[in-house]
């Protein structure tokens, strides 16, 4: 399909760009999207949670009371799990939560969420731009010109390559994220409701 290209003033340039139907008009696969989001979040987990078990704790191993005759419950040493301050039974251990998906599945997940955003009218293609210096106001002006209400929308800007001035200009705005095509993932697309794609990024995205 063809879509209009806008400039940073929010005006149509009179030019159009083709967004491939194979990327922006596919039938969403909810289960694949779920798997890819789960993979992304699982891979971010540190997995360093650890609690000491009975054999790892210091302290006397002396039995606290005799086995029979006290009238109370049986107790072992001071590290017994049944006592306050004792060891934990089956506590967490360091582990790797990450898992992998096939490339085709990850591509399908990205296509699914891109198609959803396109169907909702949340995709805008803007001609390439940059800022001379990092200024939050310039980025807010850009959003205003594109009729994007930052207060009510979450925005993802997709760059062809890293641009520090654009990144720094948007960093102080809580509902705005900036990424590059090479780092684009399903979770980030799903987490926002508006996408601003720079013109030079379209070719790479069409190859998803």
From Swiss-Prot:
User: What GO terms describe the biological role, i.e. biological process, of this protein?
Assistant: translation
Q: Where is this region: Disordered?
A: 45-78
Read off the Pfam families from this record: Ribosomal_L4
Query: Keywords for this entry?
Result: Ribonucleoprotein, Ribosomal protein, RNA-binding, rRNA-binding
A GO cellular component annotation here is: ribonucleoprotein complex
Cited SUPFAM superfamilies? Ribosomal protein L4
A GO molecular function held by the record: structural constituent of ribosome
What InterPro entries does UniProt report for this protein, alphabetically? Ribosomal_uL4, Ribosomal_uL4-like, Ribosomal_uL4_dom_sf
Q: Which domain of life is it from?
A: Bacteria
Q: Belongs to which family?
A: Belongs to the universal ribosomal protein uL4 family.
Task: Report the function annotation for this chain.
Answer: One of the primary rRNA binding proteins, this protein initially binds near the 5'-end of the 23S rRNA. It is important during the early stages of 50S assembly. It makes multiple contacts with different domains of the 23S rRNA in the assembled 50S subunit and ribosome.
Read off the PANTHER family from this record: 50S RIBOSOMAL PROTEIN L4, LARGE RIBOSOMAL SUBUNIT PROTEIN UL4M
Complex formation: Part of the 50S ribosomal subunit.
UniProt protein name: Large ribosomal subunit protein uL4
């Amino acid at each position: 399909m063809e879509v209009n290209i806008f400039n940073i003033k929010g005006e149509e340039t009179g030019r159009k760009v083709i967004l491939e139907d194979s990327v922006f008009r596919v039938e969403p696969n909810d289960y694949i999207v779920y798997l890819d989001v789960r993979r992304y979040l699982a891979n971010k987990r540190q997995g360093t949670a650890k609690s000491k078990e009975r054999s790892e704790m210091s302290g006397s191993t002396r039995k606290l009371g005799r086995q029979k005759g006290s009238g109370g419950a049986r107790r072992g040493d001071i590290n017994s799990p049944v006592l306050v301050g004792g060891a934990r039974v089956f506590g967490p251990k360091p582990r790797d939560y990450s898992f992998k998906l096939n490339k085709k599945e990850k591509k399908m997940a990205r296509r699914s969420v891109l198609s959803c955003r396109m169907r909702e009218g949340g995709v805008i293609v803007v001609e390439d731009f940059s800022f001379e210096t990092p200024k939050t106001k310039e980025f807010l002006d850009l959003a205003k010109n594109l009729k994007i209400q930052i207060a009510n929308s979450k925005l993802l800007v997709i760059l062809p390559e890293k641009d520090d001035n654009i990144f720094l200009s948007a960093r102080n705005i809580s509902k705005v994220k900036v990424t590059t095509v090479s780092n684009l993932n399903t979770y980030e697309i799903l987490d926002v409701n508006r996408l601003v794609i720079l013109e030079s990024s379209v070719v790479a995205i069409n190859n998803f």
